């Protein structure tokens, strides 16, 4: 069962009374009255990144991937919350310095503000990122039509090439 089937079969009915949730199938929460746009993503070691040898690259990947949900909706990400889970050895002082430096670089590059988060201890590394932006409207996934233009920035498939070469 893929992500969309799982949502439809088990969780979509729980959001029926919340039009801002977009039936849980549009990657963001959008409250038009408050102009609030929110996305949440989780990244797990062994699934979204093979290991934690290069914490700085993992952080760059997860920040950029997380803000892309808002950017794809035509919204500038402004704030983010990050929660991390990992062992003491994986969250060593050396790795924490790399994580902090990488977060700082990404914040400057994309004009983001860290606004909170959480940490916990576990043997595998996992991060959850919540991104927040504000807009009067968004580009909705279900509004795409035949013959609409699609624009791509960067290199297509660069993520998989990087993944295969660096990890």
How would you describe each model-predicted region?
Residues 1-167:
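Helix-biased detector of long, well-ordered alpha-helical tracts
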């Amino acid at each position: 069962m893929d992500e969309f089937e799982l949502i439809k079969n088990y969780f979509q009915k729980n959001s029926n009374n919340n039009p801002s949730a977009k039936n849980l199938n549009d990657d963001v929460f959008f409250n038009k009255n408050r102009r609030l746009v929110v996305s949440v993503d989780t990244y797990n070691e062994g699934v979204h990144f093979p290991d934690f040898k290069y914490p700085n690259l993992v952080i760059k990947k997860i920040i950029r991937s997380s803000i892309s949900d808002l950017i794809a909706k035509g919204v500038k990400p402004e704030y983010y919350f990050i929660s991390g889970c990992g062992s003491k050895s994986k969250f060593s002082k050396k790795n924490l310095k790399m994580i902090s430096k990488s977060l700082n670089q990404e914040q400057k590059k994309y004009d983001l503000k860290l606004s909170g988060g959480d940490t916990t201890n576990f043997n595998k590394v996992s991060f959850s990122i919540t991104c927040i932006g504000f807009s009067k409207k968004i580009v909705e996934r279900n509004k795409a039509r035949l013959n609409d233009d699609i624009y791509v920035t960067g290199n297509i498939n660069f993520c998989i090439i990087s993944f295969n070469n660096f990890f």
